[in-house]
Amino acid sequence: SSDVCSSDLGDIVQGNIRIKTQGEKFSALLYVTSINGFHPSEGQKRYNFENMTPIFPNERLIMERPGGTTAMRIVDLISPIGKGQRGMIVSPPKAGKTTLLKDVAKSILRNNKEMHLIILLIDERPEEVTDIKEAIQGSNVEVIYSTFDELPEHHKRVSEMVVERARRLVEHKQDVVILLDS
């Protein structure tokens, strides 16, 4: 008998594949070993994002860290960030938004090890993507990007996939931060 497991947009499915034959374009997935890092049976226990209750931020994310920048201390004092909060950095070009974003990412990794961090880079230069991928690394970090040479439809599709990915992780009771640079 074969077990059937379902996956949704945003799930990362791992498993064993069958070697493709000459007429096939893709290899077939023979056996699913994990969905989002969990055993496939865990997927049936996960919550449905649409049925979850939104709440106001009630747990703070500390940005100051040893060896970090003064900017993160200022964020903690002037504009503290809480889990579940949305925020925006607005500034003219070349004012340091990407540098601030990297500082925030490093602080989240250092001070909130349970957080899953997704960094979404839209309409960026490939060099900036490489810089962030090298600067921000970890087992709970995903850097997703759509460079400036991609079509706007691709930017939109990548953005929607990141939101769905975050939803799937939240359904598994994981805390997720999306940092968007566009």
Region spans (language model):
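Conserved ASCE P-loop NTPase core motifs with emphasis on AAA+ ATPases
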Residues: 45-57
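Short, small-residue-biased leader/transition segments that mark boundaries at the very start
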Residues: 4-6
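Phosphate-binding glycine-rich loops and their immediate beta-loop-alpha structural context
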Residues: 54-159
